[in-house]
Amino acid sequence: MPATRIDGKAIAAKLREDVAAEVARLKRDHDLTPGLAVVLIGNDPASEVYVGSKTKQTVAAGMASFEHKLAADTPQAQVLALIARLNRDPAVHGILVQLPLPKGLDATIIVNAIDPAKDVDGLHPVNAGRLASGLPALTPCTPLGCIILAKTVHASLEGMNAIVLGRSNLVGRPLVQLLLNENATVTIAHSRTRNLPALCRQADLVFAAVGRPEMVKGDWIKPGATVIDVGINRLPGEGGKSRLVGDVAYAEAMEVAGAVTPVPGGVGQMTVACLLVNTVRAACAIKGLSAPSV
């Protein structure tokens, strides 16, 4: 029997509805409008699309959106000055600098300049450290989305064997911490891991975030496992057009797994929705309010 297709698009839409309801409550009860500032440097086409989507969804949720577009040759000192101004702005509760940055700009220095309380990408070392310590923290959006998707299949992840393929600071490492906080038993794998297919076959939960098209084959997957595919890879398609695939061989996985996220229509849909969640959480924390329901 084919696996269940995890509909990230529908789950993200429901999450955005919940965020909009929470924003309306904050406006009504506390005169608080969560505000998100997005900084886009340069004219990378993919980044422009991402920022446009973030701005549109922020406004649709009833939040304040502040978009700052800078030229690719903007000096780093000017970028840091903008971030310092946003850190002080009481109308801004979340700050996101769209990555990757143009050459000549140091992403580490720029990200670390963001006030950790407004770091809705969850990349500041303070938030990474709090997450690793099991303390409340703003969490990177994609790993947060992965956990939400997995919990639509399993009410609890406690005691489950999970494997995370990929150890990036953006996805793999924070995802491991989130899984540990859920009391899952976690293996983290990477390019140097030995016997990777055998390790995958032991996992109840497989999270693929390696950036290698269709690397995870059907015979890597334990029957009935849940597979969350974070990869977004573009391959040549018919008629000179390209096609998007994940890090998992989707058709093969559907014949073995219990549930699988598609690409597109899976994890990617959750990332912006979780950015909205983080912005609302940041706004409540900054204003000294109890944690929101989303």
UniProtKB/Swiss-Prot annotation:
GO terms for molecular function: methenyltetrahydrofolate cyclohydrolase activity; methylenetetrahydrofolate dehydrogenase (NADP+) activity. Pathway: One-carbon metabolism; tetrahydrofolate interconversion. CDD domains: NAD_bind_m-THF_DH_Cyclohyd. The keyword DNA-binding does not apply. Keywords: Amino-acid biosynthesis, Histidine biosynthesis, Hydrolase, Methionine biosynthesis, Multifunctional enzyme, NADP, One-carbon metabolism, Oxidoreductase, Purine biosynthesis. Its EC number is 1.5.1.5, 3.5.4.9. Catalyzes the oxidation of 5,10-methylenetetrahydrofolate to 5,10-methenyltetrahydrofolate and then the hydrolysis of 5,10-methenyltetrahydrofolate to 10-formyltetrahydrofolate. Homodimer. This is Bifunctional protein FolD. It comes from Afipia carboxidovorans (strain ATCC 49405 / DSM 1227 / KCTC 32145 / OM5) (Oligotropha carboxidovorans).
